Structures are given as C-alpha cells and as structure tokens.
A protein has these predicted regions:
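C-terminal, loop-rich substrate-recognition/catalytic regions characterized by aromatic stacking residues
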Residues: 64-68, 73-78, 165, 172-283
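Alpha/beta-hydrolase-fold catalytic nucleophile elbow
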Residues: 16-19, 156-159, 238
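Secondary-structure transition/capping motifs at alpha-helix termini
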Residues: 7-13, 132, 143-154, 197-202
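Short helix immediately C-terminal to the catalytic nucleophile in hydrolase catalytic domains
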Residues: 1-5
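Short beta-strand/loop motif that positions the catalytic acidic residue
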Residues: 118, 124-126
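Catalytic histidine neighborhood in serine/cysteine hydrolases
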Residues: 145-170
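Accessory cap/linker subdomain of secreted extracellular hydrolases
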Residues: 6-8, 13-117
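Conserved alpha/beta-hydrolase "acid-adjacent" motif
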Residues: 131-138
Length: 283
C-alpha cells in the first residue's frame, strides 16, 4: 500500500498502509533494532520466500523443519546447516545471511527515504502488540508527517497483534482482553468512513489520530501522535524488584541475577513455535 501511495497516480485518492514494512533491518520482520529475528524469519522463509511461477494456483509453502523444542533445535544449528534445510531457491534467506550489518543492501530496500510529496490521503494502521511490523507503522506515520506535511494524514494505533484490526473476533492477547468490539469499531467507525469520505465525498473528515488506551480500554482522539497532552513520567527500578516514580536515595542499591543461555529462564509454555502471545506470556 505504501508503494502504491508513492506512485503519484492521479486516480489514486486514498491509501491505507496497515502494518507497513518500512525498514527490514531497523525494526520490521527480519530484524528488530538490528537483531536478527531468527525464529520468526526462518519460519517465514519456509512459506513466503519460495520462488514460484505466476499465476499461483496452489499453496507452495514448505513444512517447517523446526523441531519440537525450538530453542534446542536452533542451538544445534550453524548458518550453513540452517540454509541446507531450505531449498536453494530461497534467495532472500541467503541474502539475509550475507548482509548481517546495516549496509547498502538494507538501505536500498528501506522506504524511509521515499516518504515525501505523497498525494493521496493516508490512513496508517498499527498495532501496539504487532510482533512483525510495529516499527513500520509508527515510523511511517512519523516520517510522512515530517517530510510530507501537505499530505492528508491519519493514524490509528490500537492494542492489536499483527493483523488483528481485521479480525472481527479479536478480543486481546493471551489473558489480557480489550473488549469484543475493538476491531469491529475500527472497521465500522474509522476505516469505512475514511474511504467513504475520500472516495465518495460523503460523511465527515476523519479525525487525524485514533489511539486505543489499553489502560481504560477506550478510543481517544487527538491531533497528533504521541499526543501533546501526554503526561510523561519517569519510572525507576528498585532493588526489591518493584517500580517507583521516585528515584532511590541509596546510591549503592543493585539487583543481580544469573543469565545462562544453556539454561534459559522460560517465558513460553510451548517451545515448539512462536505465536503472537509471546509478548505477554511472561506477565
């Protein structure tokens, strides 16, 4: 959707980049803050990176080779053995391994440098619990607002996992529930009116920003995100394992723990795969 918006085609009036990929090294899909999302991208490779002819008439995905204990399975693999477990047609996987640092390969594939002079109205949609492309949504909005100020820009940020905004049954993540109408409200009261206004000229101009406050489970409307009305607080770690809004007066306080990769502290009940609830599973 972002690439379509950049085309400048005169017939294109409104575009909604939803969980848009912005930079594959800084924060979307392949890497998060430069760290390779190994389990995610390796699993993804088995069904998304495979070369195929067009048009596609059947699912060409491959069964995941990851064993029942994913942590142990990856520990016993080298980059070469990981590659050999996949067909040699998976060119993108090989290129990921060939470019472990932020070099020209990743810069050329980044959308950041192109987000300017955007003509159609834009509705960027992102999820606070999107394990794949949270970076892309936040920074696509931020960069369009900065570099393309004439664009009619709108932003929606909800307590969704990846793609949850179009799941009518989405209630929350794990045991944390946000209400049964979170996605239904978005589709009925935000997304549909956006396209109706810009494509048909009907209804009211949409609000610039809709943000779902997970503490109160309510939608909030504001002119920009982050809102100028936010009250920022500094939270301090305390030696008793708690949190405080006041700094400790004990300059010598500390907390210690042992981190042993060979015996990790578990945070997922099921180690055979990665699902969307891993972001809250240790809470």
């Amino acid at each position: 959707a972002t690439m379509a918006a950049l085309s400048g085609h005169p017939a294109l009036k409104a575009v909604s980049p939803q969980a848009p990929i912005l930079d594959w090294f800084k924060g979307d899909d392949v890497h998060h803050n430069g760290a390779l999302m190994l389990m995610d991208i390796y699993s993804f490779a088995t069904y998304m990176f495979k070369d195929h002819d067009n048009p596609v008439t059947e699912d060409h995905g491959l069964p995941s080779p990851i064993g029942p204990d994913a942590y142990e399975w990856f520990q016993n693999k080298t980059p070469l053995s990981l590659t050999l477990a996949l067909p040699d047609t998976l060119q993108f996987w090989n290129e990921i391994l060939q470019h472990p640092d932020y070099d020209e390969y990743w810069v050329e594939r980044s959308i950041e440098q192109h987000l300017h002079d955007i003509r159609p109205a834009i509705l960027v949609v992102g999820g606070a619990y999107d394990t794949d492309d949270c970076y892309g949504a936040l920074n696509t909005y931020k960069l369009i607002r900065k570099n393309s100020p004439e664009t009619d820009l709108h932003f929606v940020y909800g307590s969704w996992s990846h793609g949850g905004w179009h799941d009518a049954g989405y209630e929350g993540l794990g045991t944390r529930k946000f209400g049964t109408d979170l996605s239904a409200y978005f589709m009925k009261n935000i997304e549909f009116p956006f396209f109706r206004f810009y494509l048909e000229g009907k209804g009211r101009r949409p609000e610039p920003v809709y943000a779902f406050a997970s503490g109160s489970d309510q939608w909030q409307k504001t002119d920009v995100w982050p809102s100028d009305e936010l009250d920022y607080k500094t939270i301090y770690l305390s030696s008793d394992g708690g949190l405080s809004f006041t700094a400790s007066e004990d300059a010598e306080s500390f907390a210690s723990y042992v981190s042993d990769p060979a015996s990790p502290v578990p945070f997922m009940a099921d180690a055979s795969s990665r699902d969307k609830t891993y972001m809250v599973e240790n809470q």
